[in-house]
Amino acid sequence: MAAEEPQQQKQEPLGSDSEGVNCLAYDEAIMAQQDRIQQEIAVQNPLVSERLELSVLYKEYAEDDNIYQQKIKDLHKKYSYIRKTRPDGNCFYRAFGFSHLEALLDDSKELQRFKAVSAKSKEDLVSQGFTEFTIEDFHNTFMDLIEQVEKQTSVADLLASFNDQSTSDYLVVYLRLLTSGYLQRESKFFEHFIEGGRTVKEFCQQEVEPMCKESDHIHIIALAQALSVSIQVEYMDRGEGGTTNPHVFPEGSEPKVYLLYRPGHYDILYK
């Protein structure tokens, strides 16, 4: 009997370690599965797609899905084409960035205004307390893309830049920083729209600056105001009525960027 006691004493920590290993293996399995899903999404969806006929949307829903089929039909009265973005949580910023820069290829006056505002934006962020060393590379990439447009690059080359993961993600990071900066500058106004007892700064650190965090009204308003670029979003969901619900940010302005929103995702629209 005495010989068995050490074995019993050893079994307890072994069981504990085993559970720890199992938990770790489970966590790793989940992470591996998430990586596989992201890889599949990446293979199937470019960061920004070619321009497509809007009618491709019909095929994304069942023929007897009357709500969406009717809303697509309504959308077709106002728009002819769509350019899709990868559903990775960064789609709003990527869609905004490509849509506006593409439009600037044919609008030299707006290009010069936008370039001046964008050039000064780094200085504004630094004055707010953002570290220049931290944001400099992201700002440089942003300005490089604007200068690419200024040199009258082709839409195909601009699209290639946006589908380069590093370039595209650096642009997204900088647009997130601009959004955060504006929200914090205007914190007295925006604090009333933030739930959970968080400060505007906490909200920005948790919901705006990190990559892959989805965007809502508050993000759109802030970026539109920060760069003085009006955005019209067509909201398409399962709500009643056979029409999409357009919303212009800021209200009453003349839209320069047109986006389609379906729950959790933004794509680019063309008239």
From Swiss-Prot:
OTU domain sequence ranges: 80-271
UniProt note on regulation of activity: By free ubiquitin: binding of free ubiquitin triggers conformational changes in the OTU domain and formation of a ubiquitin-binding helix in the N-terminus, promoting binding of the conjugated donor ubiquitin in UBE2N/UBC13 to OTUB1.
Gene Ontology MF annotations: cysteine-type deubiquitinase activity; deNEDDylase activity; ubiquitin binding; ubiquitin protein ligase binding; ubiquitin-protein transferase inhibitor activity
Site (Interacts with free ubiquitin): 221, 235, 237, 261, 266
Gene Ontology CC: one annotated term: cytoplasm
Swiss-Prot/TrEMBL catalytic activity: Thiol-dependent hydrolysis of ester, thioester, amide, peptide and isopeptide bonds formed by the C-terminal Gly of ubiquitin (a 76-residue protein attached to proteins as an intracellular targeting signal)
PTM annotation (Phosphoserine): residues: 16
Listed name of the protein: Ubiquitin thioesterase OTUB1
